[in-house]
């Protein structure tokens, strides 16, 4: 029964037939190949995610994830009319007076969802299926939000995707039904095998200025990731990190919006 997310393959078919009396029975093997891709379940991100440290209060998680970023094109002197959050503190240290960021509000929001399927190193020593499946479900839900808001988005991962060449691991940002169907199919085909370290993806995407928002989803933040994730921080990108477990999130830059899964009172995760 195909009751779990994944790729299911049906091979050769054995056909047996005959008359009602069972006197003349014939059989035949038919060459047959068919695969069924079971998609991940949706997850309610408002119910299942919480800002790490709860720094954002009761504000909508969905709003923080899809809020349109704007490109910073310069700075100007603070007049007292601008929001305090727009103050550019680095310039204050340089010029000795408060400066605020100037934004290009025509800048198009384009997102890239990054999925890390590695739970520990080496990855095969512990595969946390519950954490991985919850992460994959969150990815589906976020993709649906981007689609609904007509925000072009892409997807990239470091895991092997069943039925595809090993290096075919990225969907470039776009919109449309065909693009979204491909995205869902990738999620259904995702395996638990790691093709390469996630750090390679962070390095490749670091200077991709056509992407305004990075959404990183991982079962946990390993020590090896910390410097690479923090290096993504700049004035041109909005970084969102969603981790199933909250370990090492305290070592991630406060300029990165961090989320983790809500826990029940007994310490278990809502699923």
Protein language model regions, located:
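An amphipathic, basic-hydrophobic helix/alpha-beta surface used to engage anionic
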Residues: 1-165, 217, 231
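Short, conserved, surface-exposed binding loops centered on an aromatic residue
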Residues: 103-105, 145-147, 174-178, 204-208
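Short, structured coil/loop segments at alpha-helix boundaries
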Residues: 41-43, 65, 176-177, 222-226, ...
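Von Willebrand factor type A / integrin I
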Residues: 185-271
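Short, charged loop segments at secondary-structure junctions
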Residues: 164-199
């Amino acid at each position: 029964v195909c009751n779990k997310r994944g790729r299911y393959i049906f091979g050769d078919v054995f056909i047996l037939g005959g008359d009602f009396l069972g006197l003349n029975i014939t059989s035949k093997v038919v060459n047959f190949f068919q695969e069924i891709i079971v998609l991940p379940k949706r997850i309610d991100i408002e119910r299942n995610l919480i800002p790490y440290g709860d720094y954002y209060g009761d504000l909508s998680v969905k709003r923080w994830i899809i809020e349109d970023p704007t490109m910073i094109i310069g700075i100007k002197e603070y007049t007292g009319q601008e929001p305090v959050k727009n103050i550019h503190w680095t310039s204050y240290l340089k010029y000795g007076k408060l400066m605020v960021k100037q934004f290009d509000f025509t800048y198009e929001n384009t997102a890239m969802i990054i999925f890390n399927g590695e739970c520990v190193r080496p990855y095969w020593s512990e595969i946390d299926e519950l954490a991985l499946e919850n992460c994959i479900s969150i990815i589906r839900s976020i993709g649906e939000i981007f689609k609904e808001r007509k925000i072009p988005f892409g997807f990239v991962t470091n895991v092997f995707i069943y039925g595809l060449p090993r290096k075919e691991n990225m969907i470039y940002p776009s919109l449309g039904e065909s693009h979204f169907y491909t995205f869902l199919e990738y999620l259904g085909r995702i395996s638990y095998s790691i093709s390469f370290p996630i750090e390679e993806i962070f390095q490749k995407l670091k200077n991709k200025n056509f992407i305004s928002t990075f959404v990183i989803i991982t079962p946990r933040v390993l020590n090896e990731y910390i410097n690479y994730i923090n290096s993504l921080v700049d004035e041109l990108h909005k970084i969102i990190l969603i981790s199933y477990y909250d370990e090492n999130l305290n070592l991630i830059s406060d300029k990165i919006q961090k989320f983790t899964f809500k826990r029940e009172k007994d310490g278990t995760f809502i699923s």
